[in-house]
Amino acid sequence: MSFRVHREGELEYLTSDVLDGAAHCFSTRFGGVSEGALASLNLGTHRGDRPENVLENYASLGRAVGFAPEETVFTKQVHSALVERVGRADCGRGLQREAEHGVDGLVTNEPGVALTIFSADCTPVLLFDPIARAIGAAHAGWRGTAAGIAARAVEAMQREFGCRPENIRAAVGPCIGPCCFETDADVPDAMRAALGSEAGQAIRPAGAKFYVDLKRLNAIWLRRAGVTCIDISADCTACQPQRFWSHRRVGNARGSLAAIIRLREEG
């Protein structure tokens, strides 16, 4: 299992081998038309970018990955453990019209629906069941991680589409790593309250502070939900400011990364 880097001209994005049966990507900063602090592949619609730039960025990425901009479905991310089932009727939500629902996970079993979640240090998790032909996407900030959003997305796929956890493949994308995610005690306390002693493997004390491994914590949740095929990116968004946006590093003066997954049509 591994993440792969794809380059087409100036465009760069990542994919995971475990999701090869679905069109998907984890974006980087490279290959768009946005300028300044948003240079260049900004995919966020509320970052102060020109709408035509954002649309062109989606079009460029979509041509390479295999989705159309109008197929995307966004959500209002609120650092929750809420997951919503969506379908073709929801396509365009967020890009062509406002995303109304405050949830942090999306699932579907309909081809032509490009589930889209945003990050700039938070953990993006993409899910694919090639047997039941269903997909999921979860945005896991530290609060969502503590609340088990990744496991909740797996449970939604079981409930809505009859997926078996052992058939679900998961890719945990680039986010702030344990090298850079320094926190006060509230973050590790929340993880231990949710995961017990198992959380300890992802928490490193450093004096009065702590360094926390969000990717490992989300992998723990996925394994608890019954998922065994888990691919984890080695990239830290805060360590690579030229390649990824990091809220921890630059605050609000930044663009947004996106993780996108779409079922391909059969046949």
Range-by-range predicted roles:
Residues M1-G267:
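Active-site microenvironment for binding and transforming phosphate-containing groups
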